[in-house]
Amino acid sequence: MKIAITGCGIGGLAIANLLADTDHEITLYDQFDTPAPVGSGLVIQPVGLRVLEKMGAAEDALAYGAAGYQMLGHESHTGRKVLDVSYGPNGGNSFGLGIHRASLFEALLNASQRKGVSITTASRVTGTTLLNRKHTLDLTGKTAGPFDLVIDASGAKSPLSPMTAKPLPYGAIWGTVDWPETTSLSYSRLQQRYRRASNMIGILPIGTLPNDNSPKAALFWSMPRNDFTLWENTPIDEWRKGAIGLWSELAPFVEQIQSHSQMTHARYSHGTLRKPYSQGLVHIGDAAHRASPQLGQGANMALLDAYALAHCLKHYALEQALAEYHKSRKRHVKIYQAMSWMFTPMYQSDSRILPILRDWLLAPSSTVPPAPKILTSLVKGTMVSPHRGIDI
């Protein structure tokens, strides 16, 4: 088959890589002149790492990233611990990999280029035209095709996805900072501080960047999505003062932010395509399902989608392959979307009641067996099988 993949992000590179050893003719289209990542830090969970291993990208990713063995969160005023999820003992084989998007992108791109993946740059996809069961890609000023299959990995702003996602009231700003030698914070933990659910600040160790061997961290600050413009027009020192007031130990990190341009806005939405495919067109990653990053599953969902789709295309004829792909991922996506919808307002919302329930009901109950194991499996992405009927 002739297959077009739109979007050179995590999902696009992953599916191109996983199909590179087939007889299909694969072309990956990207809108930028040079493929490049967008964003700051993220966490690759153990299930995502297994996909990277299948792709031949895990070694580079592990060399760049930072192994995280615990997620820890405290209420800022009382110091009460309200989030504690452990992957396993420090130094063990079970961990989440904190990594910068640029580093993950480099690992994925290198692995894909080793397999001969072809990337067509400066090609902005605006739509498709279906004729005689084949798709022609509509590009800016030109067309490409026809293709037997178009894989939409264009992300949350995909022009090919019919999804209508609901904007979430809270987003965040993210920035990359150096890890200070003077800090007492652990480089093996994602740590957060909350003031009710309306303020959250956190620090995620993310390892090193391409061509920069100094240890880095992703600094993030939660805020209402409608406050972004107000924040940009407020002196940066006022924000720094408020951030340090929320968590004084982060002063060496926060003080590195000297201008608004060092922080990237992230706006989140929530939605899922009931059927992520149609005749000769299939959606993966954020083009198929979107949620808050509170559970740390965004990149993993794209990797898991890519693995399932590649498996099905290798074992079934096209129409059945798309149906089997949807079947294999449906339950996992549905449950994690529901969990994200339920938990996110406890950490990012204007509610006064939900953070009280979080601090005084959910946090204590989360320490009673079997709750710790359930929370760990939730974060790892394995609370239910990521691929129904498919081994990984």
Name each model feature, range by range.
Residues 1-9:
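Beta1/beta-strand and adjacent pyrophosphate-binding region of the FAD-binding site
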Residues 2, 25, 216:
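Residues at the starts of beta-strands that form the adenosine-phosphate
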Residues 8-21, 29, 173, 262-352, ...:
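Conserved mid-domain beta->alpha element of the FAD-binding
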Residues 11, 34, 157:
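Conserved Rossmann-like nucleotide-cofactor binding loop
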Residues 20-40:
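Glycine-rich FAD pyrophosphate-binding loop
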Residues 28-29, 150, 194, 284:
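Generic enzyme active-site microenvironment
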Residues 40, 44-111:
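Active-site-adjacent segment of FAD-dependent monooxygenases/related oxidoreductases
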Residues 109-110, 114-263:
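Conserved FAD-binding catalytic core of PHBH/FMO-like flavoproteins
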